[in-house]
UniProtKB/Swiss-Prot annotation:
Belongs to the FKBP-type PPIase family. Tig subfamily. The gene is tig. It comes from the Bacteria. This is Trigger factor. It comes from Syntrophobacter fumaroxidans (strain DSM 10017 / MPOB). GO terms for cellular component: cytoplasm. It catalyses: [protein]-peptidylproline (omega=180) = [protein]-peptidylproline (omega=0). HAMAP family: Trigger_factor_Tig. The lineage of its organism: Bacteria, Pseudomonadati, Thermodesulfobacteriota, Syntrophobacteria, Syntrophobacterales.
Length: 435
């Protein structure tokens, strides 16, 4: 196999691969023999079909199979031989069965341009102070009370107010036609939550059971449902019932209602404080990492190809749609993949890629690698996530994308810990945090 590289730019290389004639001949002959045994052509016994006949029927198919097989088998080897590390999937083109009998193809490989990175020791960071105030615990308790509130139908005929739950039927109309997919019966609208539309709930305040009201609201162009995106929607709403929320008392019975493992209110409060503390610690780590990354990005200039950034934008849009789908929402892909939205995503997409490249560079320069124990932990985490046994993950998915991504994430965490240990630290006060 002959391999050569042509420099197109610092971030793009043309990889040229040629398979020798003898190897090509062997592969094609094998395909013809296999095809001869498999096919049935009238007038010929199985295995006795002349090659010229097979070629007239299946010649192009055989060439395509051989071409795909050679690319699949030789491309990773060619990358290794030339030490090219593609940032995204390469574009393979110019495949040829040459007159000499050889087979050749070309691949455009997008790579990270060479860059130097120094001065990452001694970065200045300010660590947020970590503390959980009583007010935070009280706020979480109030949220739990809201979750466990009892809904009672109003005994008096007072009008609905914010915080009440209105049981309603509603029918939306778009351009004079009923939007059937948007209709709902016995919908429980908590007034003030603005779950249907930011302007929807205000039209329920002051209404009584039995009343019907009509009003219009405007949906933005990027509304999740394409039928109403950028449209003015007329809602006809019938209030069937108004319920008020009755919050439970803060006592030991409430704690047990939240979770039977709590035998007293103080135990619930302590658990809430511990969970809030974990949240504060996570946020503090994220804040420090953000400070580190901002300084690292200011130290280098890396020109990425447009294709690399585009693929990261694709990934970000895909993740967003996946989040919606996981919540049971079927979204119109075109609404989230417009040129305007993609342009908005590009700065963050570029930042994501640079983050990975810079951290990878530091890990390489500082020889930061995963220990055997940390690799074992990766297998265990993937096995838990995929609901497989660890042995299966090790033997069948050791080189899978999910395992590699998990390893990469752990190395990045190791790099951040190293940089933090080498940094010059100050502290952010609670007053500064609250500003």
């Amino acid at each position: 196999m002959n391999v050569s590289v042509v420099d197109l730019s610092e971030n793009q290389k043309k990889l040229q691969v040629e398979i020798p004639p003898e190897k090509v001949r062997q592969e094609i002959e094998g395909k013809y023999r296999e095809m001869s045994r498999r096919i049935k052509i009238k007038g010929f016994r199985p295995g006795k079909v002349p090659r010229s006949i097979i070629k007239s029927y299946y010649g192009k198919t055989i060439e395509q199979e051989v071409s795909s097989q050679f690319i699949q088998e030789t491309f990773p080897e060619a990358l290794k031989e030339t030490d090219l590390k593609p940032l995204v999937e390469a574009d393979v083109s110019e495949t040829h069965f040459n007159d000499s009998g050889s087979f050749s193809y070309t691949a455009i490989v997008d790579v990270c341009p060479p860059f130097e990175l120094e001065g990452y020791r001694g970065l200045e960071i300010r660590k947020p102070s970590i503390d959980v105030a009583d007010e935070q615990v009280d706020s979480e308790l109030q949220r739990l009370r809201e979750q466990h509130a009892e809904l009672r139908t109003l005994e008096t005929e007072r009008p609905a107010r914010e915080g009440d739950v209105a049981v309603i039927d509603f029918t939306p109309s778009v351009d004079g036609k009923v939007f059937e997919k948007g209709k709902s019966a016995d919908y429980m609208a908590e007034i003030g939550k603005k779950a249907v539309h930011p302007d929807f709930d205000a039209n329920l305040i002051g209404r009584r059971a039995g009343e019907t009201v009509s009003f219009e609201v405007d949906y933005p162009e990027n509304a999740p449902m394409r039928e109403i995106a950028g449209k003015r929607v007329l809602f006809e709403v019938t209030v069937k019932e108004v319920k008020e929320k009755v919050l439970p008392e803060l006592d030991d019975d409430f704690a047990q209602a939240v979770n039977s493992r709590f035998d007293a209110l103080d135990a619930l409060k302590q658990t809430i404080r511990e969970e809030l503390l974990k949240r504060e610690e996570y946020q503090a780590r994220s804040d420090v990492q953000q400070q580190i990354l901002d300084q690292l990005l200011s130290k280098v200039k890396i020109e990425l190809s447009a294709k690399v950034i585009d693929r990261e934008v694709d990934r970000m849009v895909g993740n967003l749609l996946h989040q919606f789908e996981s919540q049971g929402l079927k979204m119109d892909v075109s609404k989230f993949n417009t040129p305007e939205i993609r342009a908005d995503y590009r700065p963050q997409a570029e930042r994501n890629i640079l983050r990975r490249l810079i951290l990878e560079k530091i890990a390489d320069q500082e020889n930061l690698k995963l220990t055997d124990e940390e690799i074992e932990q990766v297998y265990q985490e993937v096995a838990r996530y995929a609901r497989m046994d660890v042995a299966t993950v090790k033997h069948e998915f050791a080189d899978s994308a999910v395992v590699e991504q998990s390893k990469e994430s752990k190395i990045q965490e190791k790099v951040f810990r190293f940089l933090e240990s080498e940094a010059v630290s100050g502290h952010i006060s609670q007053e500064e945090k609250s500003e």
